[in-house]
Amino acid sequence: EVGEEITQTIADWEGRIIVAAVASNLSRIQQVFDAAADTGRRVVLTGFDVENIVRTAIRLKKLSLANESLLIKPKEMSRFEDHELIILETGRMGEPINGLRKMSIGRHRYVEIKDGDLVYIVTTPSIAKEAVMARVENMIYQAGGVVKLITQSLRVSGHGNARDLQLMIN
């Protein structure tokens, strides 16, 4: 299951983790929150969009936190060791690729990718952005980070397969 893989990946990494997700995928965000609670890490929300989405989802009981101290503000990161942090990057309009690019070249508002960081991509980039994603992955490696993609068998594209399309046509 996806949640188990996320928790295991986070538990196994000794340094700082940057999780790239789509802001509107609340089930994936919940899995990150659960993994953080299970592994004793705090979650930093780096974007205005994701912060608003998360706060609203918590208020509407669509997301839950194991405890209120699970979420910290970006300015509080310096109070924690790298192994205590998960940085949740969703980028503007819920797309994390540009935020990761900025992190890899030191232009992000709060985070710069450094040696020992794991960039864990738990979303499937749209087909139109695959080339951009490949370039960003290279930039992350050049900055000293390590990239891990969620297991292919666990990813969901949001698009129908050939059988689904055939069913719709007939």
Q: Which role fits each region the language model picked out?
A:
Residues 1-170:
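Acidic/His-rich, metal-assisted hydrolase cores and their charged scaffolds
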